């Protein structure tokens, strides 16, 4: 397994819509392991493939509490099939927008259909932090960032800040595979 470089704002790759995974095979399982290792190293609780430069509809997450054993999960081609009408508010952050956090309103519960690492279709009914994390990461697969839920003024301030920071650092190396 390997830690992969993170794609950060304002990289336009983050706005790209990811393509469906065609086949679950050993190379995809290895990539899932790389994604989990990258997420834990960052540290974070969720990571979409696009955040490590791969425009695939795949995400990993682990929403276990710090005092609980790790619970890594991999979602391939995830799709939200239902949402509750009840709103939920959580402070969100993002490994692609480091050190910026904001409260975001999302549906409190979602049902997500996905494929697991064995190639089997699964369904999860999620609430709480799991629902929030799944929605955040699935948004990444659609080119949507959590700052898109903020007011235009706040969003523009964040984008300006990260554009300025990007001018001061070299572009990230991209792995081609």
From Swiss-Prot:
Binds 1 Fe(2+) ion. Pfam families: Pep_deformylase. It catalyses: N-terminal N-formyl-L-methionyl-[peptide] + H2O = N-terminal L-methionyl-[peptide] + formate. GO terms for biological process: co-translational protein modification; translation. The active site is at residue 137. Its EC number is 3.5.1.88. The keyword Iron applies. Fe cation binds at residues 94, 136, 140. It is an enzyme of class 3 (hydrolase). Its cofactor is Fe(2+). Keywords: Hydrolase, Iron, Metal-binding, Protein biosynthesis. One of its GO terms (molecular function) is peptide deformylase activity. NCBIfam families: pept_deformyl, PRK00150.1-3. Belongs to the polypeptide deformylase family. Removes the formyl group from the N-terminal Met of newly synthesized proteins. Requires at least a dipeptide for an efficient rate of reaction. N-terminal L-methionine is a prerequisite for activity but the enzyme has broad specificity at other positions. This is Peptide deformylase. It comes from Chelativorans sp. (strain BNC1). The gene is def.
